[in-house]
């Protein structure tokens, strides 16, 4: 809003706030983005809160429960070994950051773990089984299971883009050898807790993953899938009485289906990626004393895009590459999303779980995308590597960028929207719509010119070092995060899942042929069978002009 006034040559405006009256103190509002005031005066812009200092963690076990870190006993033992290696206790930023970086959400520990079933260790992990298909039948797959997206060989296509993206220039047409990108990921926990923003940031994060494939690529269209317990629309249908209505922890299935589809569609519409397909499944069942249902919902965001074959693989970082962040400021938003989303919803307090939910900003993401698109369209792409800021914010994204070489981050260069943030909150907040890039030093000025044209906030926050060490350094020289890359990623213990085979049998379906018409009517009413337009056709599905029906 402030930038709009600046573009209109309205000087002297540094901050714009929106206020609206409410009846009483019980009025609903988003505590991350809004605050309830008893009156408006100049003092509302003042705060006496100071950033919390760097804290040494004396007891990792207590910290684990207090902060909702979802660390396993084996991981806690591992951190004690790291303390011994360092000869010191870990900081709150290091413990918190490690928990996010190595959460199930970020590292797929269950999929990559060891399974022992009926006393026998399985010959491969779930991830290895999935990868086996591609290994044995690669066909046209170029890259899979090692980047933000998968790429398959595409056709030769025409690219219509400016010759020089840093200035007003003629558009030229040239042939490029393309790759097709595919991506899907769940955003279950955030959508369960706060459906609109949960689904919106799920869609936004999936788009950023396609932006961050190789050294940059372009999203085209999105999809969304929702799975919930029965919504009981209009008072409920008779088969929905199989289980009593639960006291839902956050939102009802009906609210989730409506708000989540609103959120996913809204983000795509504002960003400029149409949501063109989707699905929904509602299910509950009770038999043999066991109850089944999608009480913790599934929200699957997916999409397709394309890029150039030239850019489909990341390059090797070299010492001296500049670490660049594109996008918005840091706020107290989305703290601990990786770890909290990796356990059962409801395990931690409402405060911890609500703090872990991100908030969407599609306009900022569009600005970041415009810059990345421009760099990928040029004859020389200056991007060495690229990752999106999702779970765990800077500490996860930037550490992935420098995983092969190490790096140092100057915290003074990180954009701060809330001056009360502690070092831990700056390092690990999940303020959305940011991308991390490694840029060759020689191209930095050119990239900055394009960023200014696209109004994409760009910050040079550090550089790669080549010493396999990663640290965040404050202005005073203190290091709230200071670990070897190997200590962050390399040797955390494998997850071991022990289970046994359980034989189950269910009653056969019984029916009367005379009731076929009724059965058919009921089946056609199921959300999984009925028309999905109410979920997928909410907004413009031809935005960008690249999708036709």
Question: Over which residues does each language-model region extend?
Answer:
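Contiguous, structured surface segment used for ligand recognition
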Residues: 2
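Glycine/proline-enriched, intrinsically flexible loops and inter-domain linkers
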Residues: 6-549
């Amino acid at each position: 809003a402030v930038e709009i006034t600046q573009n209109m040559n309205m000087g002297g405006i540094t901050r714009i706030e929106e206020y609206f009256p409410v009846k009483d103190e019980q009025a609903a509002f988003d505590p991350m983005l809004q605050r309830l005031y008893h009156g408006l005066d100049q003092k509302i812009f003042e705060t006496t809160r100071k950033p919390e200092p760097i804290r040494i963690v004396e007891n990792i076990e207590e910290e684990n429960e207090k902060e909702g870190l979802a660390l396993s006993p084996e991981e806690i033992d591992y951190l004690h070994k790291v303390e011994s290696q360092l000869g010191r206790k870990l900081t709150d930023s290091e413990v918190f950051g490690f928990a996010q970086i190595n959460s199930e959400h970020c590292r797929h520990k269950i999929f990559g773990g060891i399974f022992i079933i009926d006393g026998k260790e399985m010959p491969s992990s779930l991830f290895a089984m999935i990868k086996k298909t591609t290994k044995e039948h690669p066909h046209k797959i170029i890259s899979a299971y090692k980047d933000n997206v998968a790429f398959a060989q595409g056709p030769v296509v025409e690219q219509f883009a400016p010759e020089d993206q840093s200035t007003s220039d003629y558009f030229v047409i040239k042939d490029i050898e393309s790759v097709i990108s595919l991506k899907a990921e769940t955003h279950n926990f955030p959508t369960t807790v706060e459906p609109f923003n949960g689904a919106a940031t799920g869609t936004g994060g999936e788009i950023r993953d396609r932006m961050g494939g190789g050294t940059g690529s372009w999203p085209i269209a999105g999809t969304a899938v929702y799975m919930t317990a029965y919504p009981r629309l209009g008072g409920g249908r008779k088969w929905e009485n199989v289980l009593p209505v639960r006291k839902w922890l956050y939102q009802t299935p009906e609210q989730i289906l409506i708000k989540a589809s609103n959120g996913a569609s809204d983000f795509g519409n504002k960003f400029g990626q149409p949501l063109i397909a989707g699905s929904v499944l509602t299910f509950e069942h009770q038999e043999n004393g066991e109850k089944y249902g999608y009480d913790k919902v599934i929200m699957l965001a997916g999409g397709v895009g394309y890029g150039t074959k030239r850019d489909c693989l990341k390059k090797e970082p070299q010492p001296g590459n500049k670490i660049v962040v594109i996008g918005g400021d840091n706020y107290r938003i989305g703290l601990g999303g990786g770890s909290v989303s990796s356990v059962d919803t409801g395990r931690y307090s409402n405060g911890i779980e609500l703090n872990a939910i991100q908030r969407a900003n599609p306009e900022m993401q569009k600005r970041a995308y415009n810059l990345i698109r421009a760099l990928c369209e040029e004859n020389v792409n200056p991007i060495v590597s690229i990752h999106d800021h999702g779970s765990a914010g800077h500490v996860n994204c930037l550490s992935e960028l420098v995983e092969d070489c190490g790096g140092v981050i100057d915290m003074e260069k990180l954009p701060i929207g809330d001056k009360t943030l502690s070092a831990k909150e700056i390092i690990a907040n999940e303020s959305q719509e940011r991308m991390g890039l490694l840029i060759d030093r020689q191209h930095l000025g050119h990239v900055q010119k394009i960023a200014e044209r696209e109004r994409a906030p760009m910050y040079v926050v550090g550089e790669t070092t080549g010493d396999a060490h990663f640290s965040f350094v404050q202005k005073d020289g203190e290091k709230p995060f200071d670990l070897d890359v190997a200590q962050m990623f390399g040797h955390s213990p494998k997850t071991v899942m022990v289970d046994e085979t359980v034989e189950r049998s269910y009653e056969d379906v019984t029916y009367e042929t005379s009731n076929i018409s009724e059965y058919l009517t009921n089946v056609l009413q199921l959300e999984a069978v009925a028309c999905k337009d109410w979920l997928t056709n909410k907004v413009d599905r031809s935005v960008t002009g690249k999708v036709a029906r």
